[in-house]
Amino acid sequence: MAKGDPKKPKGKMSAYAFFVQTCREEHKKKNPEVPVNFAEFSKKCSERWKTMSSKEKSKFDEMAKADKVRYDREMKDYGPAKGGKKKKDPNAPKRPPSGFFLFCSEFRPKIKSTNPGISIGDVAKKLGEMWNNLSDNEKQPYVTKAAKLKEKYEKDVADYKSKGKFDGAKGPAKVARKKVEEEEEEEEEEEEEEEEEEDE
């Protein structure tokens, strides 16, 4: 069982694990009053397993295969409920950028064009250095614009909540939404890198 999640399926067992389990059950039946010395017991099981033929092991191999099927099926059922990364509603208002992100949006393409093949991390580092070298007056236009976008975002969120969630468009719109989501995720990856640079 996984810690903190009692609903997570029990892990799949190997053929050897089934063999050890069987040995333990046999020991309990033959010696119900004798406690198991796990170190000694494990050693005996290991030695016995090594001397067994493939035919003798086949029963445990089959048990392991059946358990893998059980595990895969349960994990498939468990997966969607687990949640993972929550799917975004494409109609939900996108969080507004900070002044630093607006600055990054303006200068990121310039850095990429002058440094072909530069990594996201290095772009973020350069942008962070450039931002930190700006005076408060130079930063002000970006900060002011960010504040206005935040006001608009808060209004849009209120409107969005009052109207309820989207009704789920079908067909080509879904494909377009997927492309937008992928582009947004790529942008967010760059923004996360840049956010780290801003905090340094």
From Swiss-Prot:
CDD domains: HMG-box_HMGB_rpt1, HMG-box_HMGB_rpt2. It comes from the Eukaryota. The keyword Cell inner membrane does not apply. GO terms for cellular component: chromosome; cytoplasm; nucleus. Reduction/oxidation of cysteine residues Cys-23, Cys-45 and Cys-104 and a possible intramolecular disulfide bond involving Cys-23 and Cys-45 give rise to different redox forms with specific functional activities in various cellular compartments: 1- fully reduced HMGB3 (HMGB3C23hC45hC104h), 2- disulfide HMGB3 (HMGB3C23-C45C104h) and 3- sulfonyl HMGB3 (HMGB3C23soC45soC104so). The modification Phosphoserine is found at residue 98. GO terms for molecular function: DNA binding; DNA binding, bending; four-way junction DNA binding; RNA binding. It is found in: Nucleus; Chromosome; Cytoplasm. Expressed in bone marrow cells, specifically in primitive Lin-, c-kit+, Sca-1+, IL-7Ralpha- cells, and Ter119+ erythroid cells. Residues 71-97, 161-200 are annotated as: Disordered. Multifunctional protein with various roles in different cellular compartments. May act in a redox sensitive manner. Associates with chromatin and binds DNA with a preference for non-canonical DNA structures such as single-stranded DNA. Can bend DNA and enhance DNA flexibility by looping thus providing a mechanism to promote activities on various gene promoters. Proposed to be involved in the innate immune response to nucleic acids by acting as a cytoplasmic promiscuous immunogenic DNA/RNA sensor. Negatively regulates B-cell and myeloid cell differentiation. This is High mobility group protein B3. The lineage of its organism: Eukaryota, Metazoa, Chordata, Craniata, Vertebrata.
